[in-house]
Amino acid sequence: MAAARAAVPIAVFLLLVLAEADPAAATRSPSAFVQNAIYSNRITIFSKTYCPYSMRAKRIFRDLKENPYIVELDLREDGREIQSVLLDLVGRHTVPQVFVNGQHVGGSDDTANAHSNGQLQKLLGNSQSQR
């Protein structure tokens, strides 16, 4: 009987360890994907291919000769889940959502305003800041 009681905590411990043993599962989560996309890339744009506002944000970076990491949510099976993560993270469910050096810039209008007032260039670290 004592051996059986001792085996229960060991079995519980092993279940907990094995449940956490798959780090790949954590990186497959939409939340982990979003965090990795934001912090592993200088510029990240969460976009949809058909969205004119997303096209505008991408055009701004193209005009600046920048090459952002673009996540096209409508082309991903987990696009809706990623959009829900963005809602939790920045309080917006719309696209585009633009991040520069880990900092949330905002949507299309926010990005255009940051570009026109020089804030975007400052975030990018470009010396050609417009004033």
From Swiss-Prot:
Keyword Membrane included in the entry's annotation: no
Gene3D superfamilies on file: Glutaredoxin
Binding site for [2Fe-2S] cluster: C51
One GO process term, biological-process aspect: cellular response to oxidative stress
A cellular component annotation (GO) from this entry: cytoplasm
Gene Ontology MF terms: 2 iron, 2 sulfur cluster binding; glutathione disulfide oxidoreductase activity; metal ion binding
Annotated ranges, domain Glutaredoxin: 31-131
Pfam families in the record: Glutaredoxin (PF00462)
Highest rank taxon of the organism: Eukaryota
Main location group: cytoplasm
InterPro entries for the chain: Glutaredoxin, Glutaredoxin_euk/vir, Glutaredoxin_subgr, Thioredoxin-like_sf
Subcellular location(s) per record: Cytoplasm
Keywords attached to this entry: 2Fe-2S, Cytoplasm, Iron, Iron-sulfur, Metal-binding, Redox-active center
Function: May only reduce GSH-thiol disulfides, but not protein disulfides.
PANTHER family: GLUTAREDOXIN 2 (PTHR45694), GLUTAREDOXIN-C3 (PTHR45694:SF4)
Protein family: Belongs to the glutaredoxin family. CPYC subfamily.
Record protein name field: Monothiol glutaredoxin-S6
Organism in which the protein naturally occurs: Oryza sativa subsp. japonica
Gene, per the UniProt record: GRXS6
